[in-house]
Amino acid sequence: MKRIGILTSGGDAPGMNAAIRAVVRKSIFDGIEVYGINYGFAGLVAGDIRRLDVADVGDKIQRGGTFLYSARYPEFATEEGQLKGIEQLKKFGIEGLVVIGGDGSYHGAMALTKRGFPAVGIPGTIDNDIPGTDFTIGFDTAINTVLESIDRIRDTATSHVRTFVIEVMGRNAGDIALWSGVAGGADEIIIPEHDFDMKNVAKRIQEGRDRGKKHCLIILAEGVMGGNEFADKLSEYGDFHTRVSILGHVVRGGSPSARDRVLASKFGSYAVELLKEGKGGLCIGMLDNQVVAADIIDTLENNKHKPDLSLYELNHEISF
């Protein structure tokens, strides 16, 4: 394989630049040319493609976001969009593609695979909701960003003896809420993957107040409901001096953590190895601290991401 293309798609995640850097440098080290595709699959179809050199990825490993930019492009789900994309890849002489992104990006890579074009998926999303890997690029940075906010909010919550509902991103997955909640000593963690009873939540808050507790922190995954809606429902069971903090897109930004930089570097290098060996139609992951590759079609069609619910039970046992 003489030429590899790379794109980032969907929501950005800290560490994407580190992955791009690894792909570019590993490729050049192995004598392979790399072409960067701007704006994801939209840029692919439009032919917004340029050659990348070592200098292009210098001073990038510490930066959040993606310097190749990203975009959502639902048209790539159509036959016309896919064929146009393959036409552009062939026009530039690109023989294999690295796709960094989340679930939608993986489906784009899978579509190319089904049409006979070798593509390798790298999991890059703060949501940590991709099957076939324990952790995705950007997740560690995201939970540390949330954790910093939890620590700050606790200060003001204690000063005013308040309950705070902290809404965090994650789409339909509760991993960000779960991990940051345990690390931040949350009183309650509300996630889509586990039922909850508002009456019991209110009961636990009141029990804490009765023991003299000066704050209550509830970490709410956005996939359950909005923070303001949750606070309104909670108020039906008592006045807990509740305030709502919606962290939103701030969780996506910032310099990637050491863990995300290392993870991204490992994934990027391995993606090049796979394509160099002529292997496409795969997605890369980290399972039991080992970098692995699995069939992307099988992974998407027959697997479903599951959070570590033992953390939910742990928090319930130690959060009173």
Swiss-Prot record:
ADP binds at residues 21-25, 154, 185-187, 211, 213-215. GO terms for biological process: canonical glycolysis; fructose 1,6-bisphosphate metabolic process; fructose 6-phosphate metabolic process. Homotetramer. The active site is at residue 127. GO terms for molecular function: 6-phosphofructokinase activity; AMP binding; ATP binding; fructose-6-phosphate binding; identical protein binding; metal ion binding; monosaccharide binding. Catalyzes the phosphorylation of D-fructose 6-phosphate to fructose 1,6-bisphosphate by ATP, the first committing step of glycolysis. This is ATP-dependent 6-phosphofructokinase. Keywords: Allosteric enzyme, ATP-binding, Cytoplasm, Glycolysis, Kinase, Magnesium, Metal-binding, Nucleotide-binding, Transferase. Mg(2+) binds at residue 103. ATP binds at residues 11, 72-73, 102-105. Allosterically activated by ADP and other diphosphonucleosides, and allosterically inhibited by phosphoenolpyruvate. The keyword Transmembrane helix does not apply. It comes from the Bacteria. InterPro entries: ATP_PFK (IPR022953), ATP_PFK_prok-type (IPR012003), PFKA_ATP_prok (IPR012828), Phosphofructokinase_dom (IPR000023), PKF_sf (IPR035966).
